[in-house]
């Protein structure tokens, strides 16, 4: 009797280990944890500091909500808003904010979408093909330098974003 009971329990245990599947009509998506957002922000800030720049870094979640913002000592107050706008621009267009700035430069008048900015330094954060957030950096002497710091931030968590 025990052998029969054990044999009958194997399929039940196997099904239980597969985990619950989402109900029809529900989506599941990856999301940045606070720890990962902090690591990305810190990686960007460290790169900027190593290059001699004092910057602000903003990380947004997929809903455009601020996950974390780091403002280095000695940065201008405006960098907080600009970093957020760069991250938001990268998030909603799902491309580097520098690409959006170049595209907008050819449009007269340029688009005016609340919360966006036509400056480089914002990047989408991807886990595989899925955008899981964005980063914006402001304060370095040049948009390309802001973007390099943002790239370094994402690289700091690249192994965990696969």
Question: What is the meaning of each model-derived region?
Answer:
Residues 1, 9, 92-93:
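Enrichment for repetitive, rod-forming helical segments
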Residues 17-162:
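Flexible, solvent-exposed loop/hinge segments and secondary-structure transition points
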Residues 3-4, 14:
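Cleavable N-terminal signal peptides
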Residues 9-16:
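Hydrophobic h-region of N-terminal signal peptides that target proteins for export
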């Amino acid at each position: 009797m025990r052998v029969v009971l054990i044999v009958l329990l194997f399929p039940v245990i196997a099904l239980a280990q597969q985990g619950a599947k989402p109900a029809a009509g529900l989506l599941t998506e990856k999301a940045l944890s606070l720890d990962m957002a902090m690591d990305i922000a810190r990686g960007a800030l460290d790169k900027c500091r190593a290059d001699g720049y004092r910057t602000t870094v903003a990380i947004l979640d997929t809903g455009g909500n601020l996950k974390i913002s780091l403002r280095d000592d000695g940065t201008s107050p405006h960098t907080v808003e600009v970093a957020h706008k760069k991250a938001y621009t990268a998030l909603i267009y799902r491309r580097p904010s520098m690409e959006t700035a170049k595209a907008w430069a050819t449009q007269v008048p340029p688009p005016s979408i609340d919360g966006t900015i036509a400056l480089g330094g914002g990047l989408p954060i991807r886990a595989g093909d899925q955008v899981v957030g964005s980063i914006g950096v402001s304060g370095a002497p040049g948009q390309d330098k802001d973007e390099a710091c943002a790239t370094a931030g994402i690289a700091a968590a690249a192994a965990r974003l696969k």
